[in-house]
Structures are given as structure tokens and as C-alpha cells.
């Protein structure tokens, strides 16, 4: 049996609140807003030495070497999204939930499990 490679890692999971409802209202506008939010979020994750290893529609999962870095990235991107939402009409303000977890993970190629 192949030996499993493990390491201690901090995982940040972000998800857009009520994304399906926004898609029901206007798919194209929602996708434009999502892309704009990702243009804010992705560089901030990179700035704090995070690595996005999974995305699915309206979610982003990133790995960080440090819990402090992941929290700082989450705070900065939430503040940036809040600032962005000041100029967006109320019915299309995308809000993001963020969870952070520190644990032993299993590494398989570029993906992480656990």
C-alpha cells in the first residue's frame, strides 16, 4: 500500500452567500459580479502566500502555511468586498462567508484532502 503524505496546513474556504438566488435573477450579471469579486480575492490570497487549490462556481478553497496569514487574507478580502459593494445596487451585493481550519491534511498531487 502506498504511504500517504501528510502535512499540517491552514485551509481557507470562501463561499458566496445566496449565489443560486442571484443566478436565478440574472445569470450574466451575477457571473460578471463573481468574476469581479474573484479579481479582488485571488490576488489577496496570493499576497498572503496562499495557494488556491480548488474552486467550484462560487467557492474558493486555499491553503496557507500560517493561520495568521489566512486570517489576514480573509480580513483584507472581506474589507475589499465590502468597499466594492458600496458602489453596487442592493439587490446585487455579493457577500462572502469564510471559514478557516488548521489540521493535518493529505496531499495528493496538487490537491489536498482532510
Model features per residue range: what roles?
Residues 1-73, 79-80:
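Catalytic NTP-binding/metal-coordinating core of nucleotidyl cyclase/transferase enzymes
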Residues 39-42, 61-114:
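Catalytic beta-strand-to-alpha-helix segment of the class III nucleotidyl cyclase homology domain
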Amino acid at each position: 500500500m502506498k504511504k500517504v503524505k501528510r502535512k499540517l496546513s491552514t485551509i481557507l474556504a470562501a463561499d458566496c452567500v445566496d449565489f443560486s438566488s442571484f443566478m436565478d435573477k440574472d445569470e450574466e450579471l451575477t457571473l460578471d459580479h463573481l468574476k469581479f469579486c474573484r479579481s479582488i480575492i485571488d490576488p489577496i490570497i496570493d499576497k498572503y502566500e496562499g495557494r488556491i487549490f480548488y474552486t467550484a462556481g462560487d467557492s474558493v478553497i486555499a491553503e496557507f502555511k500560517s493561520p495568521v496569514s489566512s486570517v489576514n487574507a480573509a480580513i483584507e478580502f472581506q474589507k475589499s468586498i465590502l468597499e466594492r459593494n458600496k458602489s453596487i445596487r442592493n439587490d446585487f451585493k455579493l457577500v462572502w462567508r469564510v471559514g478557516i481550519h488548521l489540521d493535518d491534511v493529505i496531499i495528493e498531487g496538487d490537491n489536498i484532502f482532510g
